[in-house]
Amino acid sequence: MTQLDSLRSMTVVVADTGDIEAIKQYQPQDATTNPSLILSASALPQYAPLIDDAIAYAKTKSDCPRQQLVDAEDKLAVNIGLEILKIIPGRISTEVDARLSYDTQATIEKARKLIKLYNEAGIENHRILIKIASTWQGIRAAEVLEKEGINCNLTLLFSEAQARACAEAGVYLISPFVGRILDWHKANTGRQDYPAAEDPGVISVTQIYNYYKQHNYKTVVMGASFRNVDEIIELAGCDRLTISPTLLSHLQAREGELVRKLAFSGELKDRPQPLTESEFYWQHNSDPMAVAKLAEGICKFAEDQEKLEKMLLERL
């Protein structure tokens, strides 16, 4: 048995890529995309027809160049999602423009638009997750969307405050980041060597997983952003793990049965009162790593969105 097969026996394996060939190879249940992955996928020759289709679509919708650009990038993200849905049995995560991360209403409207594009292509809501950054405003948007039957994946999650607020909002799924937490600790503590069990990102996801199970929250925990296979092995048993093709290939190449590391068997506890906005900011901002990584993550996704726009503009 490969380690990948062993992992699949206890955790839903998700592919963190927009590369259709990689998805075919590893046969994940679900797939996740983001602006950075859409940008790199768009450079692959097999995606050219999807880009052409997105541009043709945008031109039928508006004469305004700015609106055409917005429509083209939304349609391209959905087109890539549609191709991926042909080869996975589960859900695709498609991300809202990161530049809307602090605007609740704009996030809601963008999510509805993406869902409408999927619906028009014959895809029902139960196969889609709308990815939103885990800002206070993003979490409030997700709360509204969940009530409309639009399931959300709250990403760029680094703090306990973010995790708690997501569960309290009834969000379908969260993506707590592992590797980026490790990156911050390596850069800021001077320590470079972390065994997987002491990896701060692994510890963070483990704590969130246990908190959710302890308080009987239904929100799915999907560990994300891995730097090495050992982090993944240390989180075997997590609800879901979204993994890059490179690390999926390492797991597939290694034989052996994994030990389940995450499994809650303790007593259930009463849920606390939901966090207020001020409590959320106080707790989240008390964690300098979470503050830095959330801001950096949003900026990086926004930067790649702008690169994607530049590429589309040249074709419009």
UniProtKB/Swiss-Prot annotation:
Keywords in alphabetical order: Cytoplasm, Pentose shunt, Schiff base, Transferase
Protein family: Belongs to the transaldolase family. Type 1 subfamily.
Subunit description: Homodimer.
GO cellular component assignments: cytosol
Main location class: cytoplasm
Gene3D superfamilies in the cross-refs: Aldolase class I
Pathway the protein acts in: Carbohydrate degradation; pentose phosphate pathway; D-glyceraldehyde 3-phosphate and beta-D-fructose 6-phosphate from D-ribose 5-phosphate and D-xylulose 5-phosphate (non-oxidative stage): step 2/3
Subcellular compartments: Cytoplasm
Catalytic activity: D-sedoheptulose 7-phosphate + D-glyceraldehyde 3-phosphate = D-erythrose 4-phosphate + beta-D-fructose 6-phosphate
Active site: K131 (schiff-base intermediate with substrate)
GO annotation, biological process: carbohydrate metabolic process; pentose-phosphate shunt
GO terms, molecular function: transaldolase activity
Function text: Transaldolase is important for the balance of metabolites in the pentose-phosphate pathway.
Pfam families: TAL_FSA
InterPro entries in the cross-refs: Aldolase_TIM (IPR013785), TAL/FSA (IPR001585), Transaldolase_1 (IPR004730), Transaldolase_AS (IPR018225)
The name this protein goes by in its record: Transaldolase B
Protein species of origin: Pasteurella multocida (strain Pm70)
Enzyme class: transferase
